[in-house]
A protein has these predicted regions:
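Short alpha-helical segment of the dimerization/phosphotransfer core of two-component systems
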Residues: 1-6
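Conserved micro-motifs of the catalytic ATP-binding
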Residues: 21-26, 58, 62-68
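A conserved beta-strand-to-alpha-helix junction within the catalytic ATP-binding
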Residues: 26-44
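Short conserved segments within the C-terminal catalytic ATPase subdomain
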Residues: 46-56
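Acidic ATP/Mg2+-coordinating residue in the GHKL
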Residues: 108
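Short conserved segment of the HATPase_c
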Residues: 113-127, 147
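Conserved glycine-rich
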Residues: 154-155
Length: 176
């Protein structure tokens, strides 16, 4: 388990350094719904282990993007929504498009995030609840990767959250 955590950490650091250095990564035409479904499929076992219901809904939304980065966005948002959820809670991933932007929204019934922490959760290694870190695992880089991947694609992130009320994070990506 510790070896796998280190491999994940190294991979996360490499991805962030590529984005920091402005490395040009190859874009392709992809369907955000298909990528989100793939991330959800990969998260299903973790959701079941935590007794969290995970669902994906929406419509196909094509865009020009780096598949691995878009996957990381969906996976990391879904992973956090599961990690910081309550027993018997739910996570819903929804994809939509307005013709100009493809939108991914991950909503959960979890512990929520206080207003004073919301501006910091996308910082590297920042954790709202340090006591929860050991049991939930992770590298502390997932949401930083989300932020950088969204910026790389010229997108925006918005959040609606309150302690005890859950969290909804939306990512809007230009279709180009």
């Amino acid at each position: 388990a510790e070896a796998q955590r280190l491999v994940t950490l190294i991979g996360d650091i490499i991805r962030l350094s590529q984005l920091d250095e402005g490395e040009v990564l190859p874009k392709e035409r992809l369907d955000l719904l298909e990528v989100a479904q793939g991330a959800a499929d990969d998260l299903q076992a973790e959701a079941e282990k935590k007794n969290v219901h995970l669902s994906v809904s929406g419509e196909p939304a094509e865009l020009e993007g780096v598949r691995q980065l878009i996957y990381e966005v969906a996976y990391n948002l879904g992973d956090n929504a599961i990690k910081y959820n309550v027993d018997g809670g739910s996570v819903s991933i929804n994809v939509s498009s307005d013709g100009k932007n493809a939108k991914l929204t991950v909503s959960d019934t979890g512990i929520g995030i206080a207003a004073e922490d919301q501006s910091r959760i996308f910082e590297r290694f920042y954790r709202v609840d340090k006591s929860h870190s050991k049991e939930s695992g992770g590298t502390g880089l997932g949401l930083s990767i989300v932020k950088h991947a969204v910026q790389y694609h010229g997108g925006r992130i918005s959040m609606d959250s309150a302690p005890g009320k859950g969290t909804s994070i939306s990512v809007s990506l230009p279709i180009q």
